[in-house]
């Protein structure tokens, strides 16, 4: 029996939707909940799933058609009904009887765990990374030929126009062949690597040994040297530093060491877990070797760039203290002593000495003049003595690739004027992908179109003004630092500042219902909402989205933290549902993520307010205790509140902000952490 697929209700007050793209065609077989098409409204862009399993018999609305909610857009039936495209109209009235058998048929057992690869190599294909995504660009291989991988262990990083993600291994085994290089753009379904067992690795490994003549001596002795960009540590220990983990992040807290002194590690094998106020992440080993010293303990907060460990070989473990005494002298033997490297690699340096470029034939330590390079490319450049400032990248957006470094090392790209001073443009917060936008005119996406329309409209129909309060976050910062490890262990989510802001704002909205309100100019009525449905602004590659935490007044801080992470993740991966973007009564936007101290956020009616949270910065402040003034270093933040004067008066806005300020400065959140 055929089933009519109707345009669903995609949010409050939404009466129609525009079909932007059909993901299936007539004759295609679909499963229950498999995406059929993409629909756009003035509130959301979303995929419409199939309500039943079967074959698409007829499509009744074309792309770019605007269809009323409840309008029939397609007919789905059985395969033997395909020729009878005229029949579905009579069969549509009885969907209830169809749904039971239809939903029972397609149910499939969960896919069994991927088996280990056998001697016959298993193909690793470029996966489908989203609807309408047909290709992906390999940004970095995390493994090399000869490496052993487990099921679901990350193999490589891939970038598309919708998402950057890691691709896991479908099987356990040994990588016997890599068929696509970094920066290659590969079609979905194309084979990018092969995984087999150790025996299967023997033959392909020899085939891959030929591309770069310089790498042959390295690959002949240990098979671990498949990734020449990251050399193994030698007898002289290599410093492991606290990396820069985001813009404006100056320090990180070590939450857990995953390795101990004496442990052997491979390149990119996780060493420790680090937490900042923006991210929790694992820090990989920059070299292969043995951990000879750990210089920072768990729960220590360490500045970016500080040495936290040292890695050498087994011999280096015996006397790490002696190696520390002369780090400058160690660096020379590291490059000259390794037996794995033939003298052949020192010759290019001598030749370079006869050219103007030789004066700068070392890697720029800061890399500020370089558009963008991966850590592996930077290590390769250091190994071959190539100054990245003199290399012209051939990758996307001028990105320097491995091939560019090798070409420069071979003297293929060494112009006489390379040593000339280069303008030190900043690369902080620069997305090299955006370089291709220069000099072009492009149609905006749906999110940008809606944002442009709604923000201009909001300024025309509401009386917006902004009030700014300053809040001392020192006590919250101390409470957060003290409880972060226990919070992560118990609740499985990082404790950032945002849940504290959300908790304080939600409580203030309950206490000040005149701010959690909406004004109807036509009926001259004010609605005071019973629930606090808090919109959270999320920066996504496609643009700004504001998903909603419904009934936020009923949530604890752990529940708020989990809701924020969930909504942000689904926003960036195009997984939001229509209800996630509707019903908001107030908005919070984190304007401080890139260091902004303040802003004037734009509210979108029917909401009456939006609160910005600026960057939390340490600065000297006059404080008064027991009637005595003193100057102290405090962690301060600005909270700009934009509100609609049709709904809220200035004095009421001030009282609302004062309530938030008092809650945050008092910082009595211990009971709210549920530890």
Swiss-Prot record:
Further comment: Is the only lipoylated protein in C.glutamicum.
Cofactor: (R)-lipoate
Organism superkingdom: Bacteria
Family: Belongs to the 2-oxoacid dehydrogenase family.
Keyword hit for Nucleotide-binding: no
Lineage: Bacteria, Bacillati, Actinomycetota, Actinomycetes, Mycobacteriales
Catalytic activity from the UniProt record: N(6)-[(R)-dihydrolipoyl]-L-lysyl-[protein] + acetyl-CoA = N(6)-[(R)-S(8)-acetyldihydrolipoyl]-L-lysyl-[protein] + CoA
Keywords on record: Acyltransferase, Lipoyl, Repeat, Transferase
Stretches assigned to the Lipoyl-binding domain: 2-77, 121-196, 237-312
EC numbers for this chain: 2.3.1.12
Residue(s) carrying N6-lipoyllysine: 43, 162, 278
Known function: Is essential for both 2-oxoglutarate dehydrogenase (ODH) and pyruvate dehydrogenase (PDH) activities, but AceF has exclusively transacetylase (and no transsuccinylase) activity. The lipoyl residues required for ODH activity are likely provided by AceF.
Phenotype on disruption: Cells lacking this gene display no ODH and no PDH activities.
Regions of compositional bias (Low complexity) in chain numbering: 84-95, 112-124, 353-366
Positions of the Peripheral subunit-binding (PSBD) domain: 372-409
Region Disordered, annotated ranges: 77-124, 200-240, 316-368
Protein name (Swiss-Prot/TrEMBL): Dihydrolipoyllysine-residue acetyltransferase component of pyruvate dehydrogenase complex
Effect of residue 43 to Q: No effect on ODH and PDH activity
Active site per database record: 645, 649
InterPro entries in alphabetical order: 2-oxoA_DH_lipoyl-BS, 2-oxoacid_DH_actylTfrase, 2-oxoacid_DH_E2_comp, 2-oxoglutarate_DH_E2, Biotin_lipoyl, CAT-like_dom_sf, E3-bd_dom_sf, PSBD
SUPFAM superfamilies for the chain: CoA-dependent acyltransferases, Peripheral subunit-binding domain of 2-oxo acid dehydrogenase complex, Single hybrid motif
Pfam families in alphabetical order: 2-oxoacid_dh, Biotin_lipoyl, E3_binding
PANTHER family on file: DIHYDROLIPOAMIDE ACETYLTRANSFERASE COMPONENT OF PYRUVATE DEHYDROGENASE COMPLEX (PTHR43178), LIPOAMIDE ACYLTRANSFERASE COMPONENT OF BRANCHED-CHAIN ALPHA-KETO ACID DEHYDROGENASE COMPLEX, MITOCHONDRIAL (PTHR43178:SF5)
Substitution effect: residue 278 to Q: Strong reduction in the catalytic efficiency of ODH and slight reduction in that of PDH
